């Protein structure tokens, strides 16, 4: 399987499964069809328009205005109730899966919540935690 994360902040690399490539330039994002591709808000903004981006599963911010990105399944993250992956509480961070999502490891993930104890600024971690969740079925590093 091929997974990529465009412009992943270095501080989040510990969240990523070893098989996920940290993509640092737009050319690497467009070079092939990804099984899972994650875009940060900055990644959405820096991709040229139109971008030749294709993925089986595309994880991107719910606020990303792009319509030129192609995916079998688009999964959004953010703090909106429309986003597939969000937080149900900011005081005691709780990762919330709002709808049934396909997993790269096989099967599906049903709507549920995962506690994120001791995590400050959890909303900034949604892309990293979401990538791990879609790849492995768990938001937690093993």
Segments (PLM) and residue ranges:
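Residues that cap or initiate secondary-structure elements
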Residues: 11, 43, 63-66, 80, ...
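Generic preference for hydrophobic/aromatic residues in regular secondary structure cores
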Residues: 5, 18-23, 38, 95-97, ...
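Flexible active-site lid/hinge loop adjacent to a nucleotide/diphosphate
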Residues: 13-76
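Adenine nucleotide phosphate-binding catalytic loops in nucleotide-utilizing enzymes
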Residues: 79-142
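Surface-exposed beta-strand edges and flanking loops
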Residues: 7-9, 22, 59, 87-89, ...
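Walker A (P-loop) phosphate-binding motif
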Residues: 1-20, 142
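Residue-level signal for functionally critical sites in structured catalytic/ligand-binding pockets
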Residues: 4-5, 13, 29, 46-48, ...
């Amino acid at each position: 399987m091929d997974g990529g994360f465009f412009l992943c902040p270095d501080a989040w690399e510990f969240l990523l499964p070893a098989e996920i490539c940290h993509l640092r330039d737009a050319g690497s994002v467009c070079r092939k069809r990804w099984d899972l591709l994650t875009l940060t808000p900055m990644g959405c903004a820096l991709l040229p328009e139109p971008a030749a981006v294709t993925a089986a599963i595309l994880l991107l911010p719910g606020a990303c205005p792009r319509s030129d990105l192609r995916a079998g399944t688009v999964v959004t993250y953010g703090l909106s109730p429309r986003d597939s992956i969000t937080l149900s509480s900011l005081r005691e961070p709780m990762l919330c899966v709002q709808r049934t999502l396909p997993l790269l490891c096989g099967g599906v993930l049903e709507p549920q919540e995962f506690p994120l104890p001791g995590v400050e600024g959890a909303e900034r971690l949604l892309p990293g935690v979401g990538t791990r969740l879609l790849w492995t079925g768990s938001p937690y590093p093993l």
